[in-house]
Amino acid sequence: MEMNKVLHQDLVQATRRILKLGPSELRVTDAGLICKNPNYSVCDAMLKTDTVYCVEYLLSYWESRTDHVPCFIFKNTGCAVSLCCFVRAPVKLVSPARHVGEFNVLKVNESLIVTLKDIEEIKPSAYGVLTKCVVRKSNSASVFNIELIAFGPENEGEYENLLRELYAKKAASTSLAVRNHVTVSSHSGSGPSLWRARMSAALTRTAGKRSPRTASPPPPPPRHPSCSPTMVAAGGAAAGPRPPPPPMAAGSWRLCRCEACMGRCGCASEGDADEEEEELLALAGEGKAAAAAAGQDIGGSARRPLEEHVSRRRGVSTHHRHPPSPPCTPSLERTGYRWAPSSWWRARSGPSRPQSGPWLPARFATLGPLVLALLLVLALLWRGHGQSSSPTRSAHRD
């Protein structure tokens, strides 16, 4: 791989990060010069004494990025040790007679070239070992010691035992983490059992709600205890309890016509009330026909309960439909056997009187006795006047 500015900048940043160097501890060569001559050092780092530096890791990183065999050169400048980093090792500095050990002594102006091959040779084990370097001050003046310390197992057997221990610890930590996660989930409410319980509760609530199309109509209100209307015959006696109304259709409400509940229990419908009135009027007509055949007239006492019952029935139904306005003139409605005033007029004019004729309205029945009395008085007056005038006529004749 050819050297470019991007690769140069990446190598410099990686060196500063791995060796943990400050801004003043690393001197960087210009990228243009490195691109023209890769044999120059990319950067020079000033190392501190008694500080551990990851040399092997940095060499591996440079090798993977440049596809070359990099080399680091430790050089004693008299007052400190500098580390020169090369992408390619200079030919004049690389000698076959050099030797790199775990403990190296550097005098003034002496150098130590270190590559990955040298570090692998001093490793006690080929696997699981990371080599680091430490610069120490020697007892002699201007002399430094470079120590390459291998951190890891001492041999291959120890490395294998170390791997077994590491794998066992990892498996134990994994199982413990899974157990703790399950315990925390069960306590916090995110476990599968609690989720299943919540889902079942939600389904139960959803099943309890029915759509408006499939929901059955609400039950009708209870029947009033005193709501048992009876049928009144022509003679004024009760003919027995009224037969029960037909069953209501689903979703429908009927209006009660009985006197006790005042339309609150829904025990009868409008059609049932009309049928009952027709039956009562038919019974009254039959009673009148029987009395006429026997040569008797139906009195007010025998006909009054029937008319009062019919008027009350009609008044209740009219009240529950809509409150009517008082009419200007009393309207007549056709009954089963004669013309009679409306229920509203009968309710305000009191109980009906015996009718004087087959087609005479009921409101004129009360005027009959008065008219007859007036006629009788006039007849008596006329007769008295006639008797008083008869002696005068006889005197004139004489």
From Swiss-Prot:
The chain crosses the membrane at residues 360-382. Phosphorylated. Phosphorylation by viral kinase UL97 at Ser-216 plays an important role for correct viral nuclear egress complex (NEC) localization. One of its GO terms (biological process) is viral budding from nuclear membrane. Pfam families: Herpes_U34. Residues 215-224 have a biased composition (Pro residues). It comes from the Viruses. Residues 383-398 are nuclear. Residues 225-240 have a biased composition (Low complexity). Signal peptide: none annotated. Keywords: Host membrane, Host nucleus, Late protein, Membrane, Phosphoprotein, Transmembrane, Transmembrane helix. It is a single-pass membrane protein. Belongs to the herpesviridae NEC2 protein family. Forms a heterohexameric complex with NEC1. Interacts with host UBA7 and RNF170; this interaction promotes UBA7 proteasomal degradation. Plays an essential role in virion nuclear egress, the first step of virion release from infected cell. Within the host nucleus, NEC1 interacts with the newly formed capsid through the vertexes and directs it to the inner nuclear membrane by associating with NEC2. Induces the budding of the capsid at the inner nuclear membrane as well as its envelopment into the perinuclear space. This is Nuclear egress protein 2.
